[in-house]
């Protein structure tokens, strides 16, 4: 029986993964080693019961008594806290879904790779913050990383069986978010509620706002660089409002391979779960005649400066991605709390990158996770200062 673990089980990716696992037979088809979640203890316990999980972990130690009570008599072990989540990743599983949002997903993802099995990576921050270290760890341990972002899953599939030396360019698409047709002045004054209202995808608050600012796409550009290894001048993003084409790969013979799929994360999750084969995934089928037209346009970097900042990070590499991600997370916290404006987020990130770029770690290829965490800590402090100054100016 195939074994699996789901990190971030109660988030949107985790829920979709759980749904697909249950459709494929649940505990009759899989041995669930570990499930982790946040404060939604009721849902985490429901999942653990349904999958007969060996271990359930909440990220919050204060929630542990509730989890223990909810799973009493089931035979499922329970634990709480960041260290417990990291230790859960030390339990070998054939297939691990890494869906914890933010830099918190880096440690369990790294530890899971050391078993030399398959990591389905939905936590883009892992590649952004420690891409070179992550890929090296996978190679050294004979592990496989499968991208779960719809765009990177699309690139992965388009490259199957191809000679990467013949790849001229990789194009990932962006919906443009809720502000794709808004003026700069209107974007500047937007509210949190407006920023989190995504037109195409059903996602959580933070990733929806990242999509609106195109910081999500900026992370994905960096992720493409780190996962596939292409040079920055061969990687680009285009706005594609229909969200049907997820990525395109251009080859040296002039051909352009496009991957089309529904705007449903279960498509990419299902591909990773069924890999190296394919299996039934319950998503809507595309009707091209009904869609009628697919449109593309260049993104406006004045309205969405995150893309420009991403190119700087792609060129610098080293631990610049860790600084970028840390600053982005702090800036997002301040925007959600109403302390800074929408466009201030990019300014905070840019000021943070400038401030920490003189540190020896900034351009260094990391040798250990501790270096990644050190840059993350340094950038978070710098971003807090930058955000505080922006707040004072409002």
Curated annotation (Swiss-Prot):
Which reaction is catalysed here?
A: 2-C-methyl-D-erythritol 4-phosphate + NADP(+) = 1-deoxy-D-xylulose 5-phosphate + NADPH + H(+)
Q: Which residues form a coiled coil?
A: none
GO terms of molecular function? 1-deoxy-D-xylulose-5-phosphate reductoisomerase activity; manganese ion binding; NADPH binding
PANTHER family associated with the record: 1-DEOXY-D-XYLULOSE 5-PHOSPHATE REDUCTOISOMERASE (PTHR30525), 1-DEOXY-D-XYLULOSE 5-PHOSPHATE REDUCTOISOMERASE, CHLOROPLASTIC (PTHR30525:SF0)
Question: What functional role does this protein have?
Answer: Catalyzes the NADPH-dependent rearrangement and reduction of 1-deoxy-D-xylulose-5-phosphate (DXP) to 2-C-methyl-D-erythritol 4-phosphate (MEP).
Q: Which NCBIfam families match?
A: Dxr
Q: What is this protein called?
A: 1-deoxy-D-xylulose 5-phosphate reductoisomerase
Tell me the organism. Answer: Cereibacter sphaeroides (strain ATCC 17029 / ATH 2.4.9) (Rhodobacter sphaeroides)
Encoding gene, per UniProt annotation: dxr
């Amino acid at each position: 029986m195939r074994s699996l673990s789901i990190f971030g089980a109660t988030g949107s990716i985790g829920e979709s993964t759980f749904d697909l696992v249950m459709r494929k037979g649940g505990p009759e088809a899989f041995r669930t080693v570990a499930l982790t979640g946040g404060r939604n203890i009721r849902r985490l316990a429901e999942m653990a019961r349904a999958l007969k999980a060996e271990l359930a972990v909440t990220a919050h130690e204060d929630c542990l008594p509730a989890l223990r009570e909810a799973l009493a008599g089931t035979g499922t072990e329970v634990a709480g806290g960041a260290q417990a989540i990291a230790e859960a990743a030390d339990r070998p599983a054939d297939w691990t879904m890494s869906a914890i949002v933010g830099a918190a997903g880096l440690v369990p993802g790294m530890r899971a790779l050391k078993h030399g099995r398959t990591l389905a990576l939905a936590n883009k921050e892992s590649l952004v913050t420690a891409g070179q270290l992550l890929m090296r760890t996978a190679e050294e341990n004979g592990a496989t990383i499968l991208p779960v972002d719809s765009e990177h899953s699309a690139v992965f599939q388009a490259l199957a069986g191809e000679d990467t030396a013949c790849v001229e360019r990789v194009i990932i698409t962006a919906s443009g978010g809720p502000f794709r047709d808004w003026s700069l002045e209107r974007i500047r004054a937007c509210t949190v509620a407006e920023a989190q209202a995504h037109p195409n995808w059903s996602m959580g608050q933070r990733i929806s706002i990242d999509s609106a600012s195109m910081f999500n796409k900026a992370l994905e550009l960096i992720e493409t660089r780190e996962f596939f290894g292409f040079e920055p001048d061969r990687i680009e993003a285009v706005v594609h409002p229909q969200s049907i084409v997820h990525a395109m790969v251009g080859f040296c013979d002039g051909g352009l391979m496009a991957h089309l799929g529904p705007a449903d994360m279960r498509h990419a999750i299902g591909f990773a779960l069924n890999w190296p084969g394919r299996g039934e995934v319950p998503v809507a089928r595309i009707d091209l005649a009904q869609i009628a037209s697919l449109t593309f346009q260049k993104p406006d970097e004045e309205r969405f400066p995150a893309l420009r900042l991403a190119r700087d990070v792609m060129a610098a590499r080293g631990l610049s991605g860790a600084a970028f991600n840390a600053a982005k997370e702090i800036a997002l916290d301040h925007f959600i709390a109403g302390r800074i404006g929408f466009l201030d987020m990019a300014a905070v990130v840019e000021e943070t990158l400038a401030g920490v770029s003189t540190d020896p770690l900034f351009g260094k290829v990391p040798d250990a996770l501790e270096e990644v965490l050190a840059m993350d800590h340094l950038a978070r402090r710098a971003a807090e200062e930058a955000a505080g100054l922006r707040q004072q100016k409002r």
